[in-house]
A protein has these predicted regions:
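N-terminal secretory signal peptides that target proteins for export/translocation
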Residues: 1-14
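N-terminal twin-arginine translocation
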Residues: 9, 27-30
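Bacterial N-terminal signal peptides
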Residues: 15-28
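Sec/Tat signal peptide C-region and signal peptidase I cleavage site
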Residues: 31-35
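Cationic-aromatic interfacial patches
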Residues: 36-130, 135
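Surface-exposed, glycine-biased beta-strand/turn segments
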Residues: 45, 127-241
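Contiguous, well-folded functional domains in the mature portion of proteins
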Residues: 88-121, 128-134, 138, 233-267, ...
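Catalytic cores of peptidoglycan-degrading enzymes
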Residues: 186-318
Length: 318
């Protein structure tokens, strides 16, 4: 059949629409959420069908009946859930969310995530999802630092070990309420780019531990802001990380900020997104001025940039 000008335009418009729909479907398929129907009107979803070392997953429980209790297990740890701040509509009566951290050294494999719910009225519903964790691709870098940070003397080593015990105690503390509200932000204003998370480091020729934070090279004195609302639980000089601030955001979520030239925060301060915590510097084990920004999620080391990505429809932290 021959096509006149009008029909030809309609033909190409239809082809374009079909192509656009195909592209949209492909995009949604590439970022599909993982979903499980648990029965009794309860569903469990994860923000990705599989993941890699050092990443963060958002979990969501939706229920047609109000929930009296939600408990969850991941990596042999409890995962606290919070009630969604936006009131559910339609057939959904309750929405709860939780964050799952995949440690940067967690072996690749398939792991179970289990959520137990108790509906109003007493019925118990169990949800289970298997999560495929793939190996991350982390580069190796060689750095030269002051000898004392690779081969510390007995006094320096004792100090570093004592600080490690204190840090573990901080990260083991789970504040039962959510202190943050909304998306997290990058701690620096401007076009600073963060990198180096997970890199395997060789320090002065000696193998070191994987890099557990994101580095932002920036001039000394650049203001560093809190990524979200929380409470300052540490603000002092530490042996390896120099002038350091740690913020507790509740529910086992901590951000930490290292190598400051100056600390402007104090333990006990309540800070909001954008509050100045200190200024970029080169204290501790460094090769130059930069911000080391880290994220701990229920005592797992996660790429801090992951929490910034969790915004938008379906992935909000409201």
């Amino acid at each position: 059949m021959r096509l006149d000008g009008h029909n030809l335009r309609r033909h190409f418009l239809a082809r374009a629409i079909i192509g656009a729909v195909g592209l949209i479907c492909a995009l949604f398929s590439a970022t599909a959420m993982r979903a499980e129907d648990c029965g009794s009107g309860v569903t469990l979803t994860l923000s990705a069908p599989e993941t890699t070392q050092g990443t963060l997953l958002l979990s969501e429980i939706r229920s047609a009946t109000e929930l009296d209790e939600v408990t969850a297990k991941w990596n042999d740890r409890d995962v606290p859930f919070w009630r969604n701040s936006q009131k559910p509509t339609g057939p959904i009566a309750d929405i709860r969310k939780g964050l799952l951290g995949v440690d940067l050294e967690k072996p690749a494999g398939v792991y179970d995530f289990t959520v137990a719910t108790r509906l109003k009225g007493g019925e118990h519903v169990i949800c289970r999802l298997s999560v495929n964790v793939r190996e991350g691709h982390f580069e190796t870098e060689s750095l030269t630092v002051k000898k004392q940070f690779v081969e510390p003397n007995p006094e320096q080593e004792a100090r570093a070990q004592a600080e490690a015990v204190r840090l573990k105690a901080i990260y083991d503390t789970l504040t039962p309420e959510r202190l943050w509200n909304g998306p997290f932000r990058i701690p620096l204003d401007g076009e600073f780019k963060g990198s180096n998370f997970g890199k395997r480091r060789v320090l002065n020729g000696h193998p070191g531990s994987p890099h557990g934070g994101v580095d932002f090279p920036a001039p000394t004195g650049t203001p560093v802001h809190a990524a979200q609302k929380g409470r300052v639980v540490l603000a002092e000089e530490l042996y390896f990380s120099g002038n350091t601030v740690i913020v507790d955001h509740g529910l086992g979520i901590y951000t930490f900020y290292c190598h400051f030239s100056e600390i402007d925060a104090h333990v006990g301060d309540t800070v909001g997104p954008g509050t100045v915590l200190g200024k970029v510097g080169a204290t501790g084990r460094v090769t130059g001025p930069h911000l080391h920004w880290g994220l701990e999620v229920q005592h797992t080391r996660v790429n801090a940039l992951e929490v910034v990505k969790l915004r938008g429809i379906g992935n909000d932290l409201q």
